């Protein structure tokens, strides 16, 4: 017979080995761009930002004054024409630029909006860069959307003012990891956080 104390030691040893193996397997399963502290890094081979680059608000203002902002002729389309075109092509596939990174994309029966920003400026409060042109439509004028795509959480892409007032709460939302909470707390329920390289089937005709 095996001594009771020895048996307990053997069992503890085996459990310890199993636990270590589980931890190693868990770590190995994590993608390269996931760091242990829950943050992320760029894929291998990505350009590395120089540590010498520092943000200076004074330099930013100085360089900004050098930029000549001019708009091409007919760059801004009259809102009446925008509405007429959306109505005219409502049964067709189309891409309509609303402003900056905000696009309306219609594919079959699915209407998609990307990075919806309808606020006057990009920032947490009244501060932040102002728009150079107004969006082609107001938020309450866009057609019903079925899918909202958020690329990242910079202020000029994730606009909390727009998210709070977004009229179509049943829209399916796809966001990067850890950003779904901003939509859920504003009563948008169908929120899906996605990692790099992941795919999701939106409906029978569309996979993202």
Model-based region annotation:
Residues 20-123, 127-128, 133-141, 175-208:
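Metallo-beta-lactamase
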Residues 105, 115, 152, 159, ...:
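Divalent metal-coordination and catalytic microenvironments
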Residues 123-124, 159-161, 184-185:
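Short glycine-/acidic-enriched loop or helix-start segments at secondary-structure transitions
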Residues 5-13:
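Sec-dependent signal peptide recognition
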Residues 127-174, 190:
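Active-site metal-binding motif and surrounding structural segment of the metallo-beta-lactamase
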Residues 97, 155, 194-198:
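Tryptophan-centric aromatic hotspots in well-structured domains and transmembrane helices
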């Amino acid at each position: 017979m095996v001594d009771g104390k020895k048996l307990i030691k053997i069992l503890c040893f085996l459990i310890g080995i199993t636990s270590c193996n589980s931890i190693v397997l868990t770590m190995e399963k994590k993608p390269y761009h996931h760091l242990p502290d829950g943050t992320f890094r760029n894929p291998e081979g990505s350009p590395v930002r120089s540590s010498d680059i520092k943000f200076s608000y004074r330099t930013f203002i100085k360089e900004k004054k050098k930029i000549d902002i001019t708009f091409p002729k007919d760059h801004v389309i009259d809102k009446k024409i925008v509405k007429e075109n959306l109505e005219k092509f409502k049964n067709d596939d189309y891409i309509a630029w609303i402003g900056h990174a905000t696009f309306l994309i219609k594919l079959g029966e699915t209407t998609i909006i990307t990075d919806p920003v309808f606020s006057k400026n990009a920032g947490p409060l009244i501060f932040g860069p102002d728009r150079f042109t107004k969006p082609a439509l107001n938020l309450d004028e866009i057609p019903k959307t079925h899918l909202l795509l958020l690329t990242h959480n910079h202020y000029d892409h994730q606009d909390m003012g727009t998210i709070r007032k977004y009229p179509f709460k049943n829209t399916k939302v796809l966001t990067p990891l850890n950003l779904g909470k901003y939509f859920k707390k504003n009563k948008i329920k169908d929120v899906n956080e996605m990692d790099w390289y992941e795919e999701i089937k939106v409906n029978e005709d569309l996979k993202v």
